[in-house]
């Protein structure tokens, strides 16, 4: 009872309710919150500290910055916010200001990538058929996903694609520039309430064992020094019978990809992927190919409750 009372006391203040309402719509840093609410950083920092201590918000460090968001398990926050009137003048003004900031951030991030010449959309940069690849991903994944982690999320495009099918989606990436663009795009599209991004190393995911229903590795492994370790770490966070979907290049002979795009691997065949999946406690269930100048391969695997001794053959479509 005392924990519940402490949470109610923490929420029972106008500024803190406004903070909860904002952070429930997507992760925001202190600077963003100061811009929206028009209050000083020391004042808001005290409010945020109380909300974090009560478990109503979580603080996610990212470099020298930190973002605040409502934890997935904080059902009390959502129950409280559901009772707030949508037409409340202060809350409506906060939403408009937050939307304006999100649009500005998305525009600034996109312009920065274009100015620097960064190939932030790898499917486009390599001339790959993004529409066909996304359709294959959508077909392979369950209709209702539950909890999803997208490892190497980049611009967050996969989170956008699957937003309507997942209860909670988390995109992880090592690049703060990519995360800035992804975070702004998710907020601009109004899906940041249940789709979040976070800085992380693919070999050390900030997630508990068996905590996710689906994990995706899209166009990530060809950059990895240790693809087997990346697959094993993705499998670690999956529940038994959870799904791991790997999307990457099939074997190719385009040496320029190593020089121009820093690829470490010239694609992967079924034998290598199947062996790595098996070593991670997963069984390959299905594989698909998207043909093109560079073929793209999709491998759908299931996390096994017990280890197996030999991989099962993939169903070729």
Please give the residue ranges for each predicted region.
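Class I SAM-dependent methyltransferase SAM/SAH-binding core
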Residues: 147-149, 155-204
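C-terminal alpha-helical "lid/dimerization" subdomain adjacent to the S-adenosyl-L-methionine
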Residues: 243-299
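N-terminal helix-turn-helix DNA-binding core of bacterial DNA-binding proteins
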Residues: 2-42, 65-73, 136
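A short glycine-rich, Lys/Arg-flanked "PGG" loop and its adjoining helix->strand segment in the class I
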Residues: 228-243
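Amphipathic alpha-helical dimerization/coiled-coil segments
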Residues: 73-124
């Amino acid at each position: 009872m005392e924990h519940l009372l402490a949470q109610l006391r923490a929420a029972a203040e106008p500024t803190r309710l406004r903070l909860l309402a904002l952070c429930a719509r997507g992760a925001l840093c202190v600077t963003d919150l100061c811009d929206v609410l028009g209050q000083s950083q020391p004042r808001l920092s005290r409010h945020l500290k109380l909300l974090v201590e009560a478990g109503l918000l979580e603080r996610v460090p990212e470099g020298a910055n930190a973002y605040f968001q409502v934890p997935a398990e904080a059902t009390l926050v959502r129950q409280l916010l559901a009772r707030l009137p949508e037409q409340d003048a202060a809350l409506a003004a906060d939403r408009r200001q937050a939307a304006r900031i999100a649009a500005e951030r998305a525009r600034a991030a996109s312009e920065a990538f274009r100015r620097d010449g960064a190939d932030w959309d790898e499917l486009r940069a390599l001339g790959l058929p993004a529409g066909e690849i996304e359709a294959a991903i959508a077909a392979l994944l369950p209709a209702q996903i539950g909890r999803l982690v997208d490892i190497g999320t980049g611009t967050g495009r996969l989170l956008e694609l699957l937003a309507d099918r997942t209860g909670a989606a988390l995109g992880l990436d090592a690049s703060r520039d990519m995360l800035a663009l992804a975070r702004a795009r998710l907020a601009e599209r109004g899906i940041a309430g249940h789709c979040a991004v976070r800085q992380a190393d693919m070999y050390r995911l900030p997630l508990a064992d068996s905590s996710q229903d689906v994990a995706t590795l899209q166009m990530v492994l060809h950059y990895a020094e240790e693809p087997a370790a990346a697959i094993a770490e993705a499998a670690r966070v999956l529940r038994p019978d959870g799904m791991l979907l790997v999307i990457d290049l099939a074997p190719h002979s385009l040496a320029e990809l190593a020089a121009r795009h820093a690829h470490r691997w010239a694609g992967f065949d079924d034998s290598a992927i199947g062996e790595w999946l098996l070593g991670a406690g997963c069984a390959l269930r299905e594989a698909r190919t998207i043909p093109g100048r560079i073929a793209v391969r999709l491998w759908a695997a299931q996390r096994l409750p017990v280890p197996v001794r030999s991989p099962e053959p993939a169903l070729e479509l």
